[in-house]
Amino acid sequence: MAPVERFSSMSSGVRLHAGDDALDMLAREAQRLDAQRAFVVCGHSVATRTPLLDRVRGILGSRYAGAYTRMSKDAPLDDVREAAAEARALGADLLIAIGAGSVLKATRVVAIALGEDRPLEDLATRYSGNGPPVSPRLLRPKPPIFNVLTAATSAQDRGGAALRRADGGPRLEFFDPKTRPVTIFWDTAALLSAPPSLAVSTGLGVYWRALMNAGAIRQANPLVQAARLHAYALSRHALPRLADPLDAQPRVDMCAAALLQNRDE
């Protein structure tokens, strides 16, 4: 009898709402967690050029505590410190990230800062000599995170992040599985709020990775093969349509492809 390949598969649970008015489920999700002090993290463009922050505030009502609206590209360390300080001062018990890669990974580190209450430098992965990197065990509870995507990104369902230093030094890397999102939103209006150029650039990254993964499909187990094949199919069909500012379906499909890529790992 021919030997049967052995493999293991582990996945984290996440709730997901997609489509028209998907964001309307935000209040129900916050209520499910009994969250009373929701704090939003987003960038200046989302806060000033889209109605998303006002929409989230209206949906949450009294559960809305405040927002940090100055998160910059690549999640600078100083911005994350400021966001964590504001969230702590407002007693945040739920973090809502509105944006794409930079904001999503920054919010994870905000959660780490709130939970551990130590200098971020002490919580980062350490590299020494030629040995393997060592990630500190971050055991304290973390506030739950909701991710509201404005563009497709594989950062949507991760537990790690890297922050940029203001002095240009090595990035600070963090990992805590408790910072994986509880809920993800692919709301059509939120996704259409991003300019087509951003949708295309992020989508191209998702497609390129899907293409590379599909080329190595024979080495993968059956579950990974399925994820890779469908991620490639979704991204290949969505990519040519991302430039349409009125068509949300390819943006949703690209988000799905990016999520499947996470499950591939």
Residue ranges and their predicted role:
Residues 15, 37-39, 66, 93-96, ...:
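Structural motif
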Residues 1-94:
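ATP/NTP phosphate-donor binding region
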Residues 213-265:
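Active-site segments that bind and position negatively charged phosphate/pyrophosphate groups
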Residues 116-223:
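A glycine/threonine-rich phosphate-anchoring loop and its flanking beta-alpha core
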Residues 92-110, 150-156:
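Glycine/serine-rich anion-binding loops at beta->alpha junctions
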Residues 41-44, 98-100, 243:
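Glycine-rich beta-strand-to-loop/alpha-helix junction loops that act as flexible
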